[in-house]
Every structure is written in structure tokens, then in C-alpha cells.
Amino acid sequence: MTAVAPRRAHPFAPLVLDDTGSLEAMAEAVMRLHSTLMKVGRCYTTDATGDRAALELGRVESVLAGAFCTIFGQSPADRFADIFDQVTYMAEHMVKDHIFEDGNKRTSLVFALSVLRFASTPVVLSDSPEPKDNQYYVWIQDLVSGNRSRADLAEELRRNYVVYHDCASPV
């Protein structure tokens, strides 16, 4: 007689946010992140107000729903191989939809890395001051330009996942 072991959850399973509160909180976090990046990044635009701000928030919510919510009965766990695939999808749609007047690449990259860290799957890439040697810069540029496939970009995140065993980790 053969015993069947229960299937364990994938250690890097996609996040599922099917409640409205979580999705709204995540969208607000993106908006706050974008605002902060614009202030510290010496950008030429300021935060959107009025109708433009509402439009941006709605577009962010749409991208996040596509990445993190069940759609037509299909869970993110059914659509994405793992969380790395999921955040690459999210970053691709956020940056290519050009939601904000400025800072789309920065916001998309930093938020994707933040989601990975929140999910205890932090990624560390080379952060060289030279853009051509900076893996973060190359990753987002390749995402925007289509130089590499989304699967290749997700694989790079997967390869650079780091495990920290103490609570005082730098990530």
C-alpha cells in the first residue's frame, strides 16, 4: 500500500488578495511610495490632484487586481508560477501602462521588491553606481524595452532570492 503525502504549499506561492480592504491598502501604499520617490528623486512633476489622482489610483488598483486577485474564478496561484512571476507581471503592467507622469520605472521596481520582501522572499541584486552594471537598472530597463521575456526576468529574481536567518537582516 502506498501512502500519499499531502501536497505542501509552494514556498514561493503567489499572494492572493481577494478582499477589497487589502487591495485598497496595497494601492494606497503604491501611491505613497510614488509620492515619496518623487520627493527624494528630484523629479519635475509633483503629486497628481483631483481627477488625475483618482485616475492614477484606479489604474494602480486595476494592475494590482490583475496580479493579486481571483479573476473569473482563476486564482493568482493558477495564473503565476510563483511570487517572482507574479511581481514581474505586476511591474510590467504598472510600468508599461505608464500610470504616472514620471517615476513609473522607479515606482514599479521598488514596489515589486517591497512585495517580495513583505512575502519573506527578498531579492538582492548588484546596485552599482554605473547604470550598465546596476542589475536593478538593467532589470527594469529590460522589462520596459522587452529585451528579455517576463519569464527570464522572473527567473533573475528567483536566482537572487536571499535567505536571512536572523531578525536583524539588512533586507
Predicted regions and their residues:
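FIC/Doc superfamily catalytic core
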Residues: M1-V171
